[in-house]
């Protein structure tokens, strides 16, 4: 024991336990919240494999994110039931954008339902919203750990998130394929990728795919400059261009972010979409060149995770179950350099990890 304060277990101490004891066998819950992400199943597999085989824990999987513990929808997870899931995309537990903090008596409902399942703690795998809820629940006294995931790679407290590498590979392959049709038809092809607040996917896939312009949320763009770069390529005899744009990118005056039906989820996020189509119309009208838009959308979330994402997700899952064994509630395993370290959950949601100006400036060398 290291002397750090421990949050009490949900399960009342039995005759075998006088109180929280490091390395005792425990009963843990696990859930996956928010958008699905390649590598989620690798985390689940690692938690179950080490939790059951090494620590002797019992593992419960909640269905559909925070909705599972709110509605007591769960299943027992075993080594056998999680075999073969390592290469699978998505999550065997399902997911949702349910926000327990927005539900009437949500905290007390969670506390009551987790006690009813006789849990000692809960591991929440998710992004900004899921981990934000987990951090708030920890402050309410619930024994919760987090595992960071997002294809957007924008979580604070960690140098990288699993799912990002797979998303970049998918987007890069799409850009490679679109190059051939753009060149064949002398078209401007706009490729819209995910990235609400951070342009990591756009930047990395654009660089890897040889994009001629990359637009990200961190750098409001000048549509006139975008058109100038495209026209310069034409003047040099390059009659096609690839423009990669993150869904959250906006022009300098902030008027081209387009919302899909104005809908929001339970965490208050508006549904983004349409920036690619607006760019297509603006570029065609300003340059006279034929333009087309491809929105990659959810294909970036799906499919088989890359080897890098499988390994990172596995390492995070192993670290999470070890932290739960040591009752390190309110913490989150994070990638720091090449090491996995525990950091406070609050660090993950304190601020977004965005693209540094120098990274974007390096990409600008290849524009036009």
Predicted ranges, named:
Residues 33-36, 62-68, 97-98, 127-129, ...:
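Short, ordered loop/turn segments at secondary-structure junctions
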Residues 267, 271-368:
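C-terminal non-catalytic interaction/assembly regions of soluble proteins
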Residues 124-126, 136, 164-182, 189-289:
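Accessory alpha-helical/coil subdomains and C-terminal extensions
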Residues 42-47, 128-142, 202:
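Short Gly/Thr/Asp-enriched flexible loops that form oxyanion-binding sites at enzyme active sites
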Residues 56-60, 138-170, 215-219:
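Short, acidic/small-residue loops that bind anionic groups at enzyme active sites
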Residues 27-35, 91-96, 121-124, 189-192, ...:
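Short glycine-rich or small-residue beta-strand-to-loop segments that form or flank ligand, phosphate
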Residues 21-70:
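N-terminal phosphate-binding or glycine-rich loops at protein starts, especially the Walker A/P-loop
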Residues 10-11, 16, 21, 69-124, ...:
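Glycine-rich oxoanion-binding loops at beta->alpha junctions
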């Amino acid at each position: 024991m290291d002397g750090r304060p421990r949050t009490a277990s949900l399960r009342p101490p039995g005759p075998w336990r006088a109180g929280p004891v490091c390395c005792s066998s425990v009963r843990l819950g696990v859930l996956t919240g928010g958008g699905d992400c390649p590598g989620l199943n690798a985390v689940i597999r690692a938690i179950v494999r080490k939790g059951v085989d090494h620590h002797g824990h019992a593992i419960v999987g909640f269905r559909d994110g925070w909705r599972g513990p709110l509605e007591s929808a769960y299943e027992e997870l075993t080594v056998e039931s999680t075999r073969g899931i390592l290469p699978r995309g998505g999550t065997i537990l399902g997911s949702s954008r349910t926000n327990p903090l927005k539900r009437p008596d949500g905290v007390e409902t969670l506390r009551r339902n987790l006690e009813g399942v006789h849990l000692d703690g809960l591991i929440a795998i998710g992004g900004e919203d899921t981990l934000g809820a987990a951090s708030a629940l920890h402050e309410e006294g619930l024994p919760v750990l987090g595992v960071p995931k997002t294809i957007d790679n924008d979580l604070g407290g960690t140098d990288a998130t699993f799912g990002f590498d797979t998303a970049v590979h998918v987007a890069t392959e799409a850009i490679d394929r679109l190059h051939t049709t753009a060149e064949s038809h002398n078209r401007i092809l706009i490729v819209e990728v995910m990235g609400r607040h951070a342009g990591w996917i756009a930047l990395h896939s654009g660089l890897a795919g040889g994009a001629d312009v990359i637009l990200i949320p961190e750098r409001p763009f000048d549509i006139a400059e975008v058109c100038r770069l495209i026209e310069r390529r034409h003047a040099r005899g390059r009659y096609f261009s690839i423009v990669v744009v993150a869904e959250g990118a906006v022009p300098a005056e902030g008027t081209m972010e387009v919302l899909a039906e104005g809908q929001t989820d339970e965490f208050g996020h508006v549904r983004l979409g349409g920036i690619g189509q607006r760019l297509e119309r603006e570029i065609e009208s300003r340059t006279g060149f034929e333009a087309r838009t491809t929105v990659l959308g959810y294909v970036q979330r799906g499919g088989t995770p890359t080897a890098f994402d499988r390994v990172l997700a596995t390492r995070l899952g192993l670290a999470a179950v070890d932290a739960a064994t040591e009752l390190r509630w309110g913490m989150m395993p994070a990638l720091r350099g090449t090491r996995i370290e525990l950091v406070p959950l609050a660090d993950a949601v304190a601020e977004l990890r965005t693209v540094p100006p120098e990274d974007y400036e390096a990409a600008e060398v290849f524009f036009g």
